């Protein structure tokens, strides 16, 4: 938070009237944050982001539930709480490769484009083994100068990692579980062949 406050101060966003909201050149640091109407989880995340950003940084964020049709009209110019999750790095390719910029499939609505990131993502996708691809996926995130992570250009701000909770019958061993991505297939049973009764 200290770094964010420092950046805001350096760029001229200050609370000069004492109302808790930063302003610059007479404009309040205020905007809408959309989420899909009817999605209580994303609504809760949006409200939490708005409350914490106001309390800690001086943002005035209005949370707004919108329809999919409204989202398509506004997603290229206004922030939106989205939900992503995958156990495949292909999601990174879809989110950050310039070939996906501006499509209405929800992957790259911010029109993120970077020749360097494209180069790394293409090298990762063309690697002969998953192990060979790791270097390129990581460099796409941060290569020491640029990338898609918070150290770099951060076209996406990732706020939450969901934790999954399962009840398992006594005596059932479900083996070593991999990371369970948000809303993606059935990761719980991906290792079903390893399950056993004890």
Whereabouts are the PLM-identified features?
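Detector for C-terminal structural segments
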Residues: 3-4, 41-50, 72-198
